[in-house]
Amino acid sequence: MWRRWLCPCCSCCACFPFTADGEDNQKAMKSIRSVYKIGHGPSSSHTVGPYRAAKILGQRYPEADAWQVTLCGSLAFTGEGHGTGKAIRAALPGAEIIFNREEENLPHPNTMIFKALKDGEVIITKRVFSIGGGSIRIEGESPDEEKEIYPQNSFAEILQCCKQEGISLTEFIYRYEGEAVKDYLRMVWSVMQEAIQRGLKAEGILPGGLGVSRKAKLLFEMRCYNENADVTMNRLIAAYAYAVSEENADENLVVTAPTCGSSGVLPAVLYYMQHDRGFPEDEILDALAAGGIIGNLIRTNASISGAECGCQAEIGSACSMTAAALATLYGLNIDQIEYAAEIAMDHNLGLTCDPVNGLVQIPCIERNAVAAMRAISSVNLSRFLYATRKISFDEVVATMYRTGKDMDEKYRETSHGGLAQLYAAKN
């Protein structure tokens, strides 16, 4: 399952995983565009991915007059709460959705089996995996993403390149992505801001039956008596994170960062920095680029799927991306950026994915706010202690993946353990 990998710039070793299907995961990375996908909530792996799979297959087999889609693994256990069937039917109207909760030994915990029918006969069967962040893989086919554009696949290699050539992390990113990626990041940032602005105005109860009320507007408008600057900052950032997460839970438009369930962390911090601290948009876009490369490294070398590795893969990754983005915005050096991202992931290791009633609400919304504030703390530590660190970013990513694989499946987006189980037992 694991192999040893020799760091190109020192004598240390780190472990990197294989992909879910056993294929060696040491390969070039794709564009950061694949980390930031615009789509409707509440779950990138349970709505955005299945919708994309259904859309692709529907266009590929227009002769089909009916579709049957079987959801397995995490999709079967939490797909109803996440609205997976609704997402699939948006692309394949009238599709029959089957929840197979018995299937075991799946190649990926988010497995779908699409059957195209014509005149009552099955004409094609395709197995598709929703691998996190809205990305999919059709069995037997190459991934549906853009071309691989980075020859590097570890932070150690990126660090070596930047130091040898005397360039910053963002200069490194734009060298391979091209300046045109800024236009994409500008569009992404616009959608992120709109989600916050909608969420700060919205009120009422979120769908799904839990009776969870929206809280972003309350957080944004309510002040403590003699509230100091630190409390104000934390309150506003929490309000922005709640705003996006509540929009996501209400199935509105958000950006995966790197997933829908963790989509509130990064925009919350960057929105505060632009709108409350006055950082210009061009610098915000650079920060998004830095966060994107961190998310890219995690999805390439480990996983961003809660169903595969628990919430550490979603909120942990978002926290890590946000720490790197903020460190970049503050003008910290690449060693400090790496350490900020490492701290942020390190202190999310082991975080379980146990959504109550299979909805992306409890504890998901609150976790976005907490992770946003944790990212800021990670950056503050990295400013002063980066020269004393013992663990690399690559090593903590490998640890996260191994921890996720060791985790019992009831803590990996099945709603069979943790908070979900306790809540179900008392109701």
What are these language model-derived features?
Residues 193-297, 303-310, 418-427:
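Accessory "access/gating" subregions that flank catalytic or transport cores
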